Amino acid sequence: MYLYIETLKQRLDAINQLRVDRALAAMGPAFQQVYSLLPTLLHYHHPLMPGYLDGNVPKGICLYTPDETQRHYLNELELYRGMSVQDPPKGELPITGVYTMGSTSSVGQSCSSDLDIWVCHQSWLDSEERQLLQRKCSLLESWAASLGVEVSFFLIDENRFRHNESGSLGGEDCGSTQHILLLDEFYRTAVRLAGKRILWNMVPCDEEEHYDDYVMTLYAQGVLTPNEWLDLGGLSSLSAEEYFGASLWQLYKSIDSPYKAVLKTLLLEAYSWEYPNPRLLAKDIKQRLHDGEIVSFGLDPYCMMLERVTEYLTAIEDFTRLDLVRRCFYLKVCEKLSRERACVGWRRAVLSQLVSEWGWDEARLAMLDNRANWKIDQVREAHNELLDAMMQSYRNLIRFARRNNLSVSASPQDIGVLTRKLYAAFEALPGKVTLVNPQISPDLSEPNLTFIYVPPGRANRSGWYLYNRAPNIESIISHQPLEYNRYLNKLVAWAWFNGLLTSRTRLYIKGNGIVDLPKLQEMVADVSHHFPLRLPAPTPKALYSPCEIRHLAIIVNLEYDPTAAFRNQVVHFDFRKLDVFSFGENQNCLVGSVDLLYRNSWNEVRTLHFNGEQSMIEALKTILGKMHQDAAPPDSVEVFCYSQHLRGLIRTRVQQLVSECIELRLSSTRQETGRFKALRVSGQTWGLFFERLNVSVQKLENAIEFYGAISHNKLHGLSVQVETNHVKLPAVVDGFASEGIIQFFFEETQDENGFNIYILDESNRVEVYHHCEGSKEELVRDVSRFYSSSHDRFTYGSSFINFNLPQFYQIVKVDGREQVIPFRTKSIGNMPPANQDHDTPLLQQYFS
C-alpha cells in the first residue's frame, strides 16, 4: 500500500509540474510574473508588497516553500528596499493551498486567457478574517490588472462542498446551480501553485462511494498524514437538480462566449446520456492516473473533454454537432495552422495531430484562421449554428428531465436571473434588435450600406431593405438583402448595434421621397452619439428586477413629416399661440410619425413605430407603460426631430411633454390620486391618467366628460378592481409593479395568522388573498408547474422557447420601512410526469 501511494504521489507531482511548465510556456512576461508571485504575496503580508492592507489579514500557506523565482523576489525586496521578511508562525496556517482551475495549463489556454485562482482556507477563519482575505485578493486582482493580466480569486472554505454551501450567481461558482459539477471541474483541471496536495486524487474510483471510510483507513494505517492534504470531499452521485442548474448556467455563459460554452454544454449532455451512472470526467482522468495511462497528451483536461464529447456525439450519430464542436475547439486553442511558425510548441503539435485525424483540408483551416475578418454573412451563419446546437442540447436536457421525473434545484432567484438573460438574448420580437455577434468576429464594419424603400403595390413587400454594397443595379439584383423591416428606424438600429454601420461607412439611400441622404446621415449621427455600442453586462440584480428603460431616443417625423406640405405655401399662424400638436387654423398635428429606440436595463435594444395624427399619444402611452413607479428615471432621454420646418419648436415641445409625463409617472407624489395631463392633438382633447399601476388614455369630447374622468380617477385611482371592496395595495407593491411579467408578493400578517399574497399579472391586474396558510415553497412549486402548461411561446428560428417565469418576492420591514426582496427557497419542486405523446419544446416545462 505504501509503495502504491508513493507511486501515485510521484505521478501527481509530475503531472502538476508538467501543467505548471505548460502554463508558463503559454504566457507573456507579465502573466508569468503574476502567476509565479501570487503564492508569495498570499504567504507573506507586508506594506512593500502588492495586496497590503491594515488589519489582522490571514497570511501563510501550508507547506509553502519559495521556489527560485520567488526567493529572488524576496531577496530583492530585502536587499534593495530594506524589507525584513518574517515567516508566518509554525503550525496549521490559514491558507490550505492556492490552485488555478479552468483552461490554465491546458491546450485551451491562450495568451489572452484569464486566471481563475482558488484560495482554499481553513474553516476556522472567522467572518472578519475572511472579509480581510477577500479584500486582499481584490487588491491583488487590481495589481494584476495594472500589469494587463485578468485574475479572479475565489475563496473556498475547505468544508464548503461537504456542507453543500453555495455562492451567489454571477461568479464562476455559479450560485446554487452547481456543486458536484464544480468540484468535478476543479479536480480535473486544478494546478497546485502552493500548499497541500489534493487528497481526492489518492482515492481509487471504485472506493468513491466509500470515500470518507477509505480516507480514514489511510490515515489510521499511517499511510497518509491528515494535515498534509486538502480534502474537499468525494464526488457523490450527480443529482438531476444540480445537472439542470448547471445546464442553465452554461446557456447563460454561452450568450456572451458561445465558442467556449459549446464544449462544456455538450459534456453535460453526455453526462445525462449516461444517467443514472454518468462517468464524471474527473473520475476518468483519475482512473487513468491510477492505471499509469498518462494518455491524451498528458491527461490534458481540455483534450479529455473533447474526447468524451466525441464519444457521445459519435454514439448518437450527431455528426453535425460533432463538426461544430471540433471547430469550436480549434478556434479556442487559437493556433493558426494555415500559417507557418518557426517554433512548433506542444499546443500546435496537439492541434496538428487532431486536425489530421479529422481529415480537414487547407481551405477549412484558412477559413477558420481568417475568423478575425469574418463579416455579417459568416457571423450570422455561425451564430445561428451555435444557437441551434445550444437549443438542441436543451431540448435533450428537457427530455432527460421529463423521462426521469426529476426536479429543479436552483432557487427561484437564481432561476429568475438565468431565465431573464435568456429571455433578453433569445426572445424574438418584431421591434427587437437581434445582436448576432457575441464574440464571434471582432469587426463587422461595412464600407458601403444602401437603404432601399419599396412602396406599397410592388412585387416585393413594402418597406425598407438593407444591402452591404453600393447601389449598383446589377449587384443589388444579384444579392439578397441583409435585412428587411417595414420601418427605417429598425434597420438603422440593427446595422449600428451589430457593428456594420460605423463612422467610416459610406451611406446610400433610395427612399422614394420618404427619406433623403442628409436626413439619414443626420439620424445615424444622432443614434451613434446617443447610444454607446458596448456597455457592461447587466448585473444579476438588474436581471432579477423588472426591466427599466435606460437610454431612450424619440425620433420625430423621420418617415412622415407634415411640415413638408408647407413648401411653397403661405401658412398663417399666431406665433404667440403656436401649438405644434394643434397647429394653425386647421389645428393640424405637426408630428406625423414617432419612432422609439431604447435600450433597457437587461441590455435589450427595442424599436417601435407610430404613424398618423395620434402617433404622439400612442408613443407616450407606450413609453410610460414600460416604466413601473419605482423605476429609476432613464439615464438619458433625447428627442431627434427631422422636420423640414419648425424643427426646433417641435423638438422642444416634444421634449417638454415627454419630460413632464415621465416626471408624473415616476413622481414621489404617487399617493395622490387623479394625476393627469391634458393634451390637445388635432383639435381634440385627450387625457393621460397616471394611475397606480399604469397610464390610461381617454378621449374627452366635452367638459362634462372631461371633469367626469377626472372625478372618477380621484375617487378610485385605479383602472382595475382589487377584490370586491377596493383593498389598497401596499405602496411597495405599487412601486414594483411591472407590465409583461407575473409577480407574486408574500406579506406576513401583523397578527402572525398566515400570510397575504398579492398577485399581479402581465397587465398588472390584481388578485389579493388574505391569511393564507400552508407552505410558501409548495405554492412556488405549484405556480411554477401551472405556468409550465402555458402556450405563450416565442420563436427563434425553428426553436420554441419560453423563459418568462413568474417572479416571487417577499415584503419585509427594515428599520420600520417596508421593502421588497427576492423570495428564496431551496427547491421549486418536482416536475410533472413526462408526456409520452409529444416532446415539449425547449424549456417549455420549466419556463412557460
From Swiss-Prot:
GO CC terms, sorted: cytoplasm
Any one GO molecular-function label of the UniProt entry: adenylate cyclase activity
Pfam families: Adenyl_cycl_N, Adenylate_cycl
Leading EC class: lyase
Modified residues (Phosphohistidine): H609
Main location: cytoplasm
Substrates-to-products reaction catalysed: ATP = 3',5'-cyclic AMP + diphosphate
Keywords (A to Z) from UniProt: ATP-binding, cAMP biosynthesis, Cytoplasm, Lyase, Nucleotide-binding, Phosphoprotein
Region called Catalytic, residue ranges: 1-535
Protein localization: Cytoplasm
UniProt EC number: 4.6.1.1
GO biological process: cAMP biosynthetic process
Region feature Regulatory, mapped onto this chain: 541-848
InterPro entries, per database record: Adenylate_cyclase_1 (IPR000274), Adenylate_cyclase_1_CS (IPR024686), Adenylate_cyclase_1_N (IPR024685)
Keyword Transcription: no
Family the UniProt entry places it in: Belongs to the adenylyl cyclase class-1 family.
Protein name, entry field: Adenylate cyclase
Organism: Escherichia coli O157:H7
Gene symbol of the encoding locus: cyaA
